[in-house]
Design a protein with these regions (language model features):
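Generic N-terminal targeting/processing segments that precede catalytic cores or assembly contacts
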Residues: 1-155, 159-161
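A structural signal for small-residue-enriched, beta-sheet-centric alpha/beta enzyme cores
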Residues: 7-13, 161, 167, 172-191, ...
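Extended hydrophobic packing segments that form well-structured cores
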Residues: 88, 123, 322, 326-372
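Short acidic, gly/pro-rich beta-turn/loop elements at beta-sheet edges
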Residues: 105, 152-154, 215, 260, ...
Length: 372
């Protein structure tokens, strides 16, 4: 299916804003609606269906909206967002995190510690609703809840970022665009901002669980100093430099990081896969015969090359990989930061590390094991 044929949706921020408007309509105009139109900060209007509205008292109402992310994969898709509005005479708009909505506990995010994890975009949209409905002296407390939020939060980076108790209510435009790779990439960046705000001098980048487990369990690096990159290693390198890191350590499986050595910084197999070609090239530089090169070339996965490299005395390939990956990574970010590389097996055993990784490890007091 083409992207242009796919259905868009709306964010959790739009759900909460729509729920707020439906609740105020019920309280102030005695109007129970099944849809509302809200305005985003860019001046666009979004129609959002309302699942239910309940008047709790003369000053309190709750509206429920089912999150619809369209054709964009999203952990919150199909889940209810409940917004309770409570009228008061403070003249102010206040926000509270209900069940399943997180609270910020670390600096470096869009909202300061102690605040509900309701981002500036949704707050701005709710402020527009507040200004539309509330007269001078009338105040509203908006409590946003997501019944399944604590479970959903485990599938997000919230705990790593320091958001505890549930998911975040997000959205800058209120609209979810289908197949939003940019949106996913941008969701990774706050990890780096939190690390910097908490005084980390080195950014440790891990594509996935293998690198993360090694960093934490073997090297003694705290998980708060690590950022997951998924396949977007190049993007996260650029972001780390932009945020101000001068030292970057990348830890991961050789099958992923060998791609950096050949200059491929989007590491999804569909985008870049020259693993065997690279191993053969480095093996040849180590003196491998044509027959051995052909044997290596016919391997389907990098792990299958290990016994051959060991048998032929070609394990120097691993050092060539990390040295080249470090050089190419530093070149990728115009040498604005020092980049160290550590490559591992699927079991998390270290195969090699370059000199920058050793230097960074010493500065960070990591438990660097001896490699034979």
């Amino acid at each position: 299916m083409r992207v242009e044929d796919m259905k868009g949706g709306y964010t959790t921020g739009s759900c909460a804003t729509a729920g707020m408007k439906a609740g105020l309509l019920a309280l102030l105009e005695h109007d129970i609606v099944d849809k509302v139109v809200i305005e985003n900060p860019q001046g666009q209007f979004i129609e959002v269906p309302i699942k239910s509205v309940e008047i709790i008292s003369e000053t309190e109402a709750k509206a429920t909206v089912m999150k619809d992310g369209g054709d964009d994969p999203d952990v919150t898709h199909g889940n209810d967002v409940e917004t309770t509005v409570t009228l008061d005479d403070t003249g102010k708009l206040r926000f509270r995190a209900g069940f399943g909505v997180g609270t910020v506990t670390k600096p470096g995010l869009a909202m300061p510690p102690g605040q509900p994890a309701i981002n500036p975009g949704p707050r701005a949209m709710m402020k527009l609703v507040f200004e539309e409905f509330c007269t001078q002296g009338q105040g509203v407390t908006v409590t946003v809840s997501v019944p399944n939020g604590k479970v959903l939060a485990k599938k997000t980076l919230n705990h790593t970022l320091g958001i505890e108790g549930g998911i975040s209510i997000i959205g800058t435009t209120g609209i979810v665009k289908p197949m939003s790779e940019e949106g996913f990439k941008n969701s990774l960046v706050p990890q780096l901002k939190v690390m910097k705000a908490n005084g980390c001098e080195t950014a440790v980048l891990v594509p996935g669980r293998i690198g993360q487990d090694l960093a934490e369990q073997v090297l003694g690096i705290h998980k708060n100093q690590m950022a997951e990159t998924s396949n977007f290693i190049g993007f996260m390198l650029e972001q780390a430099v932009h945020i101000g890191f001068k030292r970057i350590l990348i830890i991961g499986h050789i099958g992923k990081l060998i791609k950096l050595a050949s200059g491929s910084f989007h590491t999804h197999n569909r985008m870049s896969d020259g693993r065997m070609e690279s191993i053969v090239a480095y093996a040849a530089l180590e003196g491998a015969s044509q027959a051995v090169c052909e044997e290596l070339f016919n391997c389907q996965i990098t792990e299958s090359t290990f016994p051959i490299l060991e048998r032929e005395g070609l394990t120097g390939v691993y050092q060539r990989v990390v040295d080249r990956a470090s050089m190419r990574s530093e070149r990728y970010i115009a040498n604005e930061a020092e980049v160290g590389i550590i490559i591992t097996t699927l079991k998390g055993e270290i195969l090699a590390m370059d000199k920058h990784a050793k230097e960074i490890g010493e500065l960070e007091h990591c438990h660097i094991p001896c490699i034979s």
